[in-house]
Amino acid sequence: LDLVVIDEAGQFALADTIAVSQAAPRLLLLGDPQQLPQVSQARHPAPVQQAALDWLSDGHDTLPPELGYFLDTTYRMRPELAAVSSHLSYDDRLDANPCTAKRTLEGIEPGLHTVLVEHDRNRTTSIEEARTVLRLVVDAVGRSWVTEEGDRPLDPADVLVVAPYNAQVNLI
């Protein structure tokens, strides 16, 4: 074996990386150090549980050029979203491919939108937020979704709702 490749190294623990690196003289880490860390129930001393790419980046938002390559183009996010993500997480180095600007959802302005929801003493679930999310999804479904391939109505299967707690996901 000449090379060990670790995909999603932004979620692969440093200890595991060191262990598998013994299998070959060369190691290639692929992934995003800004990605959410792996889920772990155990507690280990630092930096054992730290992700390999996080350890390698040593606090930088992006890897310094001498340590690796930064893929500076996203094909997933429109420019409005990529600019925010780039500023917050990628040292303003991330750009959206022009093809992403063609993606539109009829009647909804591209970008980030804040919806304030009043509630009190919620912890891992919020019925108020769940109702708001459901209302927004129902409103979006059926609208004209335009992509590089053409346009069609937005389908419920096109929508992904992410929440920080499984209890909230189940509620939604």
Mark where each language-model region is.
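Conserved helicase motor core of SF1/SF2 NTP-dependent helicases
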Residues: 1-172
